[in-house]
């Protein structure tokens, strides 16, 4: 595997997140309903848009991503963001899964007043993202400021018929979390 510096890997990961989750049209690619993009087309369109992207760089980003944000298709010809989409092109059909008793959501303290009013909502994304452990939730919350960890009564939600899904990178997904299922 070729050597790339951390900044190059981080910049490429951010670029891939942008085009594979949110704005594929920014470089002229189309994703299928499951979020897959043809790798050759992605590389070509990225290069036309002035972004240095190669298959080796893609392989390195996919292999070294601590959050496993991206995956390859079984034939190795396509790539997708595992979850976190806001583009209407994508509607990944995750298998419903029974959650553990509690899941966690990391946020910044400045968002608490709004969360106390309306619970957790997906916003521009398709799902609310939840973590199986507090440490991961804390890292997520720290990206937005002073982190606050909310405990989600996931099994109680599931018992009331609210579905959960789990992306292949371990992130738990649900449509919304009402205030009654949150512990501060």
UniProtKB/Swiss-Prot annotation:
Q: What is its EC number?
A: 2.7.1.-
Q: Name one GO biological process term.
A: tRNA splicing, via endonucleolytic cleavage and ligation
Class in the EC hierarchy, top level:
transferase
* Keyword presence, Transferase: yes
**Domain of life, per the record?**
Bacteria
Keyword terms: NAD, Transferase
Q: Provide a Gene Ontology MF annotation, just one.
A: tRNA 2'-phosphotransferase activity
**Its biological function?**
Removes the 2'-phosphate from RNA via an intermediate in which the phosphate is ADP-ribosylated by NAD followed by a presumed transesterification to release the RNA and generate ADP-ribose 1''-2''-cyclic phosphate (APPR>P). May function as an ADP-ribosylase.
Q: Which family does it belong to?
A: Belongs to the KptA/TPT1 family.
Against HAMAP family, the record matches this protein to: KptA
Protein name (Swiss-Prot/TrEMBL): Probable RNA 2'-phosphotransferase
């Amino acid at each position: 595997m070729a050597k790339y510096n951390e900044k190059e890997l981080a910049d490429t990961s951010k670029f891939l997140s942008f085009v594979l989750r949110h704005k594929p049209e920014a470089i002229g690619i189309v994703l299928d309903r499951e979020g897959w993009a043809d790798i050759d087309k992605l590389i070509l369109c990225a290069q036309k848009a002035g972004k240095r992207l190669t298959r080796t760089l893609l392989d390195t980003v996919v292999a070294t991503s601590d959050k496993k944000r991206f995956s390859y298709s079984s034939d190795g010809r396509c790539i997708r963001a595992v979850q976190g989409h806001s583009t209407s092109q994508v509607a990944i059909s995750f298998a419903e899964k029974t959650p553990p008793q509690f899941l966690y959501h990391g946020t910044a303290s400045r968002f608490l007043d709004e969360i106390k009013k309306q619970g957790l909502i997906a916003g521009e994304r398709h799902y609310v993202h939840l973590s199986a452990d507090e440490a991961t939730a804390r890292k997520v919350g720290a990206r937005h400021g002073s982190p606050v960890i909310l405990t989600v009564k996931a099994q109680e939600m599931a018992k009331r018929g609210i579905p959960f899904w789990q992306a292949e990178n371990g992130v738990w997904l649900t449509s919304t979390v009402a205030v009654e299922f949150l512990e501060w």
